[in-house]
Design a protein with these regions (language model features):
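Extracytoplasmic/peripheral linker and loop segments enriched in polar/acidic and small residues
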Residues: 404, 410-412, 440-505, 529-530
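Long beta-strand-rich cores associated with HINT superfamily self-processing modules
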Residues: 501-530
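Ligand-site clamp/hinge motif
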Residues: 201, 229-275
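Surface-exposed binding/hinge segments that line
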Residues: 145-193, 217
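N-terminal lobe/hinge region of extracytoplasmic solute-binding protein
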Residues: 49-101, 134, 208-209
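Periplasmic-binding protein-like
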Residues: 58, 301, 305-343, 386-387, ...
Length: 530
């Protein structure tokens, strides 16, 4: 149940795909906001603006990154998903109508939806479940771990798939519901276009899913186009075409939206733009639930934070409530737990870091004069940059020579190879787990093999507890793991973040098309308001 594959920083929260020109952004947020709604399209085209290119091919067994999920989740479907339009984690049907789980969490039996076809015309049957899970393992992309524990898939009939795991795993349904989870891929299409790479080349510019839309045109760096699948089994929207143009800076994206050239922007605008759209009669502004947070991680391989005393003092110096309110505003609230909000039902993962700047001030007096430290943030992340500047300014009042520094995403993920090359601490403006099970949070962020433990701050007992807890879903053991890891002083959950979606006034169904697991919309559930 471990993985060293890395996942790119989530969505615009930490996407180093675009640099924000701050003066231009300030200008477009300060004035010129229209209060007259733009006209709805009459040609059946929905336009979703992307901030930066998608970074990886939209192959569901490869893609493990940011805004390209808008393509993956509208062209492919899994057996289950997280339920739309609620603020809690609940598994809902997709291509499986129902399922049964054995008491020991080793056997998962799915009853499949009938009369579903892939975009190449191949019927969706239990054979496709078997081949799709196998392809996930064979391709060995970033989220291969979600199928790595599958021992066998039995297909007693076309509409029944029995998945047996090699060991108990209570998180398996969450793996399948994850936006990065296994999606169903046409076995015929894969075989016909296999080439030498299991159809990976083909799926760079085509799709083989069952979703409401087909990938019809790919212009890397410029635009992606989806076309409605005529034989889709589910709800169809009035939008027969979805265009996803790419913008390389947020001000250009925002201006296009203001003019009506873009229908909606999902999780891409900085919090500094909140006031512009809140209550504006021309636009919708929706704050939708997610599992994501702003996070602080501390680097124990750096001399400044070699001792736990220093790490804990630093975390106590952060005025969490003020920082979240000042920078993130209405899209966030201060986090009170170590996992995502509500992930542990009784709240026993309570975060016990209390703001007390005197602890760091006293510790600073023991340091050599002029001691330096660096707080990092991802390039292009306006929110994280502002938070890093505030944190370092406060540290400077203690005599510590603290500075804030930006790092490109590629460099951030290189730190796991040598944490000494990283900063002393790092602020994630927005990051989250692969799914709604506590294991998918703790393993990813706290285990050095999990993928987003940048500085490899690892506690073996935490890892052992997580690996044991996932077998049965033992919340008490998950909570124990969280408290043990928190005591290392390597981690702080700053805020619970919401997915901020701005859309034209004529666009209806935004909340209904969104679920807590992904910062994306199901385009088939969108419509034009009457």
């Amino acid at each position: 149940m471990t993985s060293r594959k890395t996942r790119k920083l989530v969505r615009a929260g930490l996407a180093a795909l675009a640099v924000v020109p701050m003066l231009a952004l300030a200008a477009c947020t300060a004035s010129g906001t229209t209060s007259t709604p733009n006209a709805a399209p009459s040609d059946g085209v929905l336009t979703i603006g992307l901030l930066g290119d998608i970074g990886q091919p939209p192959d569901p067994d490869i893609y493990y990154a940011n805004n390209g999920l808008a393509i993956v989740l509208n062209t492919y479907e899994g057996l289950v998903q997280y339920k739309n339009d609620i603020d809690t984690v609940e598994i809902a049907p997709r291509l499986a109508e129902s399922w049964e789980v054995s008491p020991d969490f080793t056997t998962y039996t799915f009853t499949l939806k009938p009369d579903v076809t892939f975009h190449d015309g191949t019927p969706f049957t239990s054979a496709a479940v078997k081949s799709s899970l196998q392809r996930r393992v064979d391709v060995d992309g970033g989220a291969a771990y979600m199928a790595a524990g599958v021992a066998s898939v039995d297909t007693p009939d076309d509409l029944t798939a029995v998945v047996t795991l090699s060991e108990p795993n209570s998180a398996f349904l969450d793996y399948l519901a994850s936006p990065f989870g296994p999606k169903m891929v046409s076995p015929t299409g894969v075989e016909e276009n296999a080439g030498s790479d299991n159809a990976q080349t083909y799926l760079q510019t085509h799709d083989l899913g069952t979703g409401p839309y087909e990938l019809s045109a790919v212009e890397p760096g410029a635009k992606y186009t989806l076309t409605q699948y005529d034989d889709y089994w589910g709800t169809k929207s009035p939008f027969t075409t979805v265009e996803l143009p790419i913008y390389n800076d947020v001000s250009a994206l925002q201006l296009a939206f203001d003019k009506g050239d873009v229908s909606a922007i999902v999780a891409a605008l900085p919090s500094s733009s909140l006031d512009k759209y809140d209550g504006n009669a021309a636009f919708n502004s929706d704050m939708l639930p997610t599992l994501q947070s702003a996070l602080v991680t501390v680097n124990p391989s750096k001399p400044f934070f070699a001792e736990k005393e220093a790490r804990l003092a630093f975390l106590q110096s952060i005025d969490q409530e003020k920082l979240v309110d000042q920078v993130l505003g209405a899209r966030s609230e201060p986090a009170t737990t170590l996992y995502a909000k509500g992930m542990i039902s009784d709240g026993s993962d309570k975060q016990n870091i209390e703001y007390d700047p005197t602890v760091m001030a006293d510790y600073a007096k023991t340091l050599p004069e002029g001691s330096e430290m660096v707080v990092g943030y991802a390039s292009g992340n306006t929110n994280a940059e502002q938070m890093a500047n505030i944190v370092t300014a406060n540290l400077q009042t203690t005599g510590i020579q603290a500075t804030a520094q930006s790092y490109p995403t590629s460099q951030v993920f290189g730190w796991a190879n040598d944490p000494t090359q990283g900063p002393d601490a790092f602020i994630d403006g927005n990051n989250g787990p692969d799914g709604g099970n506590p294991y998918m949070w703790g393993h990813v962020f706290w285990d050095k093999t999990g993928g987003i433990n940048y500085f490899l701050c690892d506690d073996p007992s935490t890892d052992a507890d997580l690996n044991e807890a996932v077998k049965t879903g033992d919340e008490a053991l998950f909570a124990k793991a969280a408290q043990t890891y928190s005591a290392t002083g390597c981690y702080m959950n700053l805020s619970y973040n919401k997915d901020w979606v701005v859309s034209q006034k004529w666009l209806d169904g935004v909340a209904e098309s969104h679920n807590i697991g992904a910062n994306e919309l199901d385009f088939s559930l969108l419509s034009i308001a009457e």
